[in-house]
């Protein structure tokens, strides 16, 4: 083979790896382990796009490098196959999700294999396989059968809580539980019937039913998480989302808030990700106090949580969340209609949107007043959408002088602003600094903020109207989805009380349905399943688990994927331990990464695993960006208006498949055939055409802006794609995809090939390498290894290119040097490396060969280029041998022609020579 035939080479070695099970992984106690994992993909579209391989290639480079350093490497891959993305794709294509998911998984595996990724495919898992989700259901049952002991800071079996209730009732039990729990004695507990006991236990279980306000999308027919809603629309599909009360399964993740915070300290994660989790958990220390309100002839108490009890005398109003139970109750008759309208509008916005929209102030006065606990002055009570029902008590005391959101609210509605902390000017903005002394504050006057905080809490406690409290922003995780394509929740109902399906009857398999589409009323598709009951005739839960259920523990299953007795065996878990390096997108910071930590800590508490944290080190690969196209739907219609005419209408931007667009012009017929709901679409055109909007953003299936890597592999080969993807820039940075530079990377691989082959055939010799060749190759060994260790893959590729250029210039065809070159190239371009390794005469795979060691002797420079400065300003650079005495350097510098012109006729006061650093002439 005289030319670089990448197609033949890549097919040959991919088949070789498969036939010889080169990447099959076993437990080797004599070797150190290394567990490297990619976040597994959703197989929800037509396959991978060029943005996906960025993290996969990076992890593969590290996996191959670690094998070459003597580690036993676990590097698996699987598929996050349940959930909304896969189901929506099935609905769009009119096929059953089981069919589309299986087809997409096959396509993904084919694409991953053709990239030369060194996965152990024997360990492949899919979250939609009954053998897998049997254990997802089993873990849910463990959550249902557990409670959290605050005194011990760990989960315990529910049977132990029952024993405590039998012995002492619940009055002394320190447990994470519902806010309102009825107290009972041991005797009262013992007198209860079974149904009453189960109802009480539900308030303590870590998996429990609750009435909660959710993001409901009628079009998608399901509840959405906050992160799945943007500007009141579903992130997937752009459908309207409303807020409504529903009975949902939830997981009591709030029990783990302090441990989730503490665990972050020891993780080698990006600081930004740790900060996102801290903010999402939102631990705040402050005080909770009660305000009395008399409205409509009745007295009520409004508890308020504040992190600034020192500013109590700056309160000028109270604000309730639109969802607050008193919002309607205390409203006066004249305000009621307007308040009802406002509450409806506000509650239909997601909490994320309400928090983010700092420039848009809205609110409604209830007509009622509360009494200030110290001044006894009346405080107007408002409803405001910047107050969230789930944080604190759902009510805030407005202190405009010292809180920016309160300040904006007070300015907008012309409410009083009373400054109580000295040091700032509140004429234009709130003074939020936590320094200064108190004034306008009665018994707190003259105190520092710290001392005033302490005194205010003591006063509240002495009056019996408040206490110190720690609160959290994190809510319990809603676990129900009113969809079909998910794990059935293994619960049945007896007299409306939930009970777990017996473990020996798992998996509770998802039944095959003729119609699996969601319903706008909220009735889950499983309601149409015939005989969806236990063998005793009890109805089974109709909701399914959310998309994140299967991904919350999958990293354990890779360790022991065929174990039928346990989700992971102790031998496998003891050897592989935690994931050493995890790669995936930063968008999962407050979702998957938090839930996986929660499930791991829970399983640790019950003794099923021996680690508390699943991922020791984390890398977020930057986005590979693509050019997106947009159409503009006129709200409430199926009509779309062209880009330059959109401002005349109230529209919603919607992503459209870039393959339906050419030069920003939409193919109308193909667009109407794209999805069933678009077949009746009409258009407002400009000059007879529909012009699309465009934007460079994340390449994503949901944005329909993906580019297929198959075309790149077909034209240039997988090794070129691997190298080019790494060469684009630092792994963590976002990078726009374009094909302009890929030709140069392909030429680099051709140049590597030509070190081994010319047209006449192989040209390898056994000659002793020259000093120059040794220097080039050992410098590359050192730099490439250092780059891999710090995940600087782009500079590693650059150093490989520099080395090959130097070897080409030196006309190197020496076996020893080229052997080392192939070894350091192998993690990046494994197919070509395998072929060249074979040409060098080796019988085994290069994947089993050790990484070369550089020798310091070849890195020592014989000369050094000295910068020559005159009065501190560099005027020239001259090379001298590194061992030349300083006197000789001084002599040659002063006589060098490039220096003579600067010192001619000048008196030289001193010459300072610093060996292998610089020379400075003082004149």
Swiss-Prot record:
The keyword rRNA-binding does not apply. Keywords: Aminoacyl-tRNA synthetase, ATP-binding, Cytoplasm, Ligase, Nucleotide-binding, Protein biosynthesis. The gene is leuS. GO terms for molecular function: aminoacyl-tRNA deacylase activity; ATP binding; leucine-tRNA ligase activity. ATP binds at residue 701. Belongs to the class-I aminoacyl-tRNA synthetase family. Its EC number is 6.1.1.4. A motif ('KMSKS' region) lies at residues 698-702. GO terms for biological process: leucyl-tRNA aminoacylation. GO terms for cellular component: cytosol. NCBIfam families: leuS_bact. This is Leucine--tRNA ligase. It holds the Pfam family tRNA-synt_1_2. The keyword Nucleotide-binding applies. Its main location: cytoplasm. It catalyses: tRNA(Leu) + L-leucine + ATP = L-leucyl-tRNA(Leu) + AMP + diphosphate. InterPro entries: aa-tRNA-synth_I_CS, aa-tRNA-synth_Ia, Leu-tRNA-ligase, Leu_tRNA-synth_edit, M/V/L/I-tRNA-synth_anticd-bd, Rossmann-like_a/b/a_fold, tRNAsynth_Ia_anticodon-bd, Val/Leu/Ile-tRNA-synth_edit. CDD domains: Anticodon_Ia_Leu_BEm. A motif ('HIGH' region) lies at residues 41-52. It is found in: Cytoplasm.
């Amino acid at each position: 083979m005289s030319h670089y035939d990448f197609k033949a080479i890549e097919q040959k070695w991919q088949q070789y790896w498969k036939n010889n099970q080169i990447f099959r992984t076993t437990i080797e106690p004599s070797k150190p382990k290394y567990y490297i994992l990619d976040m597994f993909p959703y197989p929800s579209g037509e396959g991978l796009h060029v943005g996906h391989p960025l993290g996969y290639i990076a992890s593969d480079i590290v996996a191959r490098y670690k094998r070459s350093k003597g580690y036993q490497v676990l590097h698996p891959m699987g598929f996050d196959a349940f959930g909304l993305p896969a189901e929506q794709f099935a609905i769009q294509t009119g096929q059953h999700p089981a069919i589309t998911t299986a087809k997409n998984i096959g396509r993904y595996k084919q694409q991953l294999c053709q990239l030369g990724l060194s996965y152990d495919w024997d360990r492949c898992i899919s979250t939609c396989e009954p053998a897998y989700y049997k254990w997802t259901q089993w873990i849910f049952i463990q959550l249902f059968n557990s409670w959290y002991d605050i005194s011990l800071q760990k989960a315990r079996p529910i049977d132990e809580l029952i024993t405590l209730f039998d012995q002492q009732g619940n009055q002394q039990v320190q447990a994470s539980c519902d806010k309102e729990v009825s107290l009972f004695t041991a005797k009262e507990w013992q007198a209860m019937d079974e149904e009453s006991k189960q109802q009480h236990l539900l308030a303590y279980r870590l998996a429990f039913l609750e009435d909660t306000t959710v993001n409901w999308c009628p079009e998608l027919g399901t509840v959405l998480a906050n992160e799945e809603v943007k500007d009141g629309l579903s992130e997937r599909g752009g459908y309207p989302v409303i807020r409504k009360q529903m009975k949902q399964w939830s997981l009591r993740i709030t029990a783990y808030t302090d441990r989730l915070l503490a665990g972050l300290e020891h993780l080698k994660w990006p600081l930004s990700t740790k900060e996102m989790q801290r903010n999402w958990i939102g631990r705040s220390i402050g005080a909770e106090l009660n305000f009395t309100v008399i409205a409509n002839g009745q007295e009520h108490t409004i508890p308020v949580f504040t992190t600034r009890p020192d500013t109590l005398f700056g309160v000028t109003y109270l604000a309730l969340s639109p969802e607050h139970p008193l919002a309607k109750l205390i409203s006066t008759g004249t305000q009621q209609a307007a308040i009802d309208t406002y509450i409806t509008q506000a509650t239909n916005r997601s909490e994320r949107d309400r928090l983010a929209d700092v420039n848009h102030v809205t609110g409604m006065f209830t007509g009622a007043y509360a009494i200030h606990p110290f001044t006894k002055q009346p405080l107007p009570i408002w409803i405001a959408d910047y107050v969230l029902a789930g944080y604190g008590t759902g009510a805030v005391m407005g202190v405009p002088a010292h809180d920016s959101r309160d300040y904006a609210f007070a300015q907008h509605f012309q409410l009083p602003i009373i400054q109580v902390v000295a040091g700032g000017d509140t004429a234009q903005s709130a003074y939020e600094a936590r320094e200064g002394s108190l004034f306008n504050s009665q018994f707190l006057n003259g105190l520092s903020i710290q001392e005033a905080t302490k005194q205010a809490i003591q006063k509240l406690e002495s009056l019996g109207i408040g206490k110190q409290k720690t609160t959290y922003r994190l809510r319990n995780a809603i676990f129900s989805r009113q969809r079909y394509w998910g794990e059935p929740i293994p619960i049945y109902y007896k007299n409306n009380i939930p009970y777990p399906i017996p473990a020996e009857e798992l998996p509770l398999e998802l039944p095959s349905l003729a119609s699996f589409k969601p319903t706008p009323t909220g009735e889950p598709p499983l309601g149409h399943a015939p005989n969806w009951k236990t063998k005793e005739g009890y109805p089974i839960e109709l909701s399914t688990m959310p998309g994140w259920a299967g991904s919350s523990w999958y990293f354990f299953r890779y360790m022991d994927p065929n174990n039928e007795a346990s989700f992971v065996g102790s031998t496998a878990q003891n050897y592989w331990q935690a994931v050493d390096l995890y790669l995936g997108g930063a968008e999962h910071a407050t979702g998957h990464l938090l839930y996986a930590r929660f499930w791991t800590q829970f399983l640790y508490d019950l003794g099923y695993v021996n680690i508390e944290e699943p991922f020791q080190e984390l890398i977020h690969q930057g986005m590979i960006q693509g050019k997106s196209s947009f159409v503009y739907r006129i709200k409430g219609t199926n009509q779309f208006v062209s880009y330059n005419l959109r401002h005349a209408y109230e529209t919603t931007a919607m992503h459209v498949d870039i393959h339906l667009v050419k030069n920003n012009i939409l193919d109308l017929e193909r667009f109407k055939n794209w999805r069933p709901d678009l077949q009746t679409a009409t258009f407002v055109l400009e000059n007879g055409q529909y012009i699309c909007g465009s934007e460079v953003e994340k390449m994503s299936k949901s944005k329909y802006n993906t580019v297929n890597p198959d075309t790149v592999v077909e034209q240039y080969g997988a090794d070129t794609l691997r190298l080019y993807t790494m060469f684009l820039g630092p792994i963590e940075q976002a990078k726009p995809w374009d094909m302009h530079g890929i030709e140069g990377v392909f030429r680099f691989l051709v140049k590597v090939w030509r070190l081994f082959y010319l047209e006449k055939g192989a040209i390898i010799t056994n000659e002793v390498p020259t000093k120059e060749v040794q220097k080039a190759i050992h410098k590359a060994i050192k730099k490439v290894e250092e780059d891999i260790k710090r995940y600087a893959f782009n500079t590693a590729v650059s150093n490989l290119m520099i080395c090959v250029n130097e070897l080409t210039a030196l006309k190197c065809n020496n076996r020893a040097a080229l052997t080392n070159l192939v070894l350091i190239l192998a993690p990046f371009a494994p197919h070509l490396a395998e072929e060249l390794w074979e040409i060098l005469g080796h019988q085994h795979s290069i994947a089993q060969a050790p990484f070369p060691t550089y020798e310091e002797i070849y890195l020592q420079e014989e000369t050094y280029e000295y910068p020559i400065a005159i009065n501190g300003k560099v005027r020239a650079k001259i090379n001298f041998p590194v061992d030349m005495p300083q006197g000789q350097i001084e002599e040659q510098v002063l006589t060098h022609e490039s220096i003579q012109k600067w010192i001619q006729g000048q008196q030289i006061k001193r010459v300072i020579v610093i060996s292998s650093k610089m020379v400075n002439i003082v004149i």
